[in-house]
């Protein structure tokens, strides 16, 4: 079992590393490529577009051909794309590399969640996804620090050499450590209970959890996107104060994420999901009424705690009904989360909504809709919580 957890964690970490590692070198990259920082900031959207593109195909391929081939190819694409970015001499080539980086990271991301669905029952899966969320929160804090240390002695290209090395390591883990987890075809007596046709992506329970996770990701990405404006322009923080504040909020996320597995031993998943949305609602109301920086910071802290306590549980529930189509389900969740959050941020910008109101709006909207869905759509107990995986006995 340890091999599956190790490989899943490594596969997921390519996604945040690809976002955060290069940011510290952005001014120097812009200067060398004769582009403005504003022009290169689109690299974030291009990276997410690459992820969404990969997710369109990676899930179905993983269900048909296996998790392992997709993981190996995804890591290889990420590695080669990182080298392409390091060799870029102008902006368009750099953005092409960023898109391909997203493709590689997106394929690995989908496979990681499919592997966890294949190998863990619902209770353990919720705990592991919460831990995974906590580990993911470490990357936005450590990656810029590592990037800064690298650039003290080496040029910005070294950042992408480092990411390329990460791709190589993940590829080697996928090749030599990861074992295939795609479930074997079921006996005829089992087909009525679990078949690709029966595991529909349009059933009410999956759609409800897809909506909850998409709204939750929209909350956290809106927070990340709006945080520079809120903290440095509205609240008057310096760059150093901003970095410290974001590190502290990431610390809150880590503590809550690592505590959630223990909470799952005491409370039902539904209770933790309601607590998560209650924290979002409280955060939205706090920010709307805040008149001091202290109160505003308290509201921002509630956002991080709310996301960490509920997201892993909701993702586990969303993947629960799928054994033969875990890859497709994981892809669908990823696409909805990336596209849904990007759409909200884009619409808010087009409509001229301020950073604070953008954040308050998604917090209150997410919490109300999610609470209604949690109460109105319960898990389907006719679906087995865990499917036996023939490969598990070999771990």
From Swiss-Prot:
Single GO term (MF): transmembrane transporter activity
Keywords for this protein: Cell inner membrane, Cell membrane, Membrane, Transmembrane, Transmembrane helix, Transport
Coarse class of the protein's main subcellular location: membrane
Membrane-protein topology: Multi-pass membrane protein
Localization annotation: Cell inner membrane
Gene3D superfamilies: Multidrug resistance protein D
Family: Belongs to the major facilitator superfamily. DHA1 family. MdtL (TC 2.A.1.2.22) subfamily.
Name of the protein described by the UniProt record: Multidrug resistance protein MdtL
This protein's encoding gene: mdtL
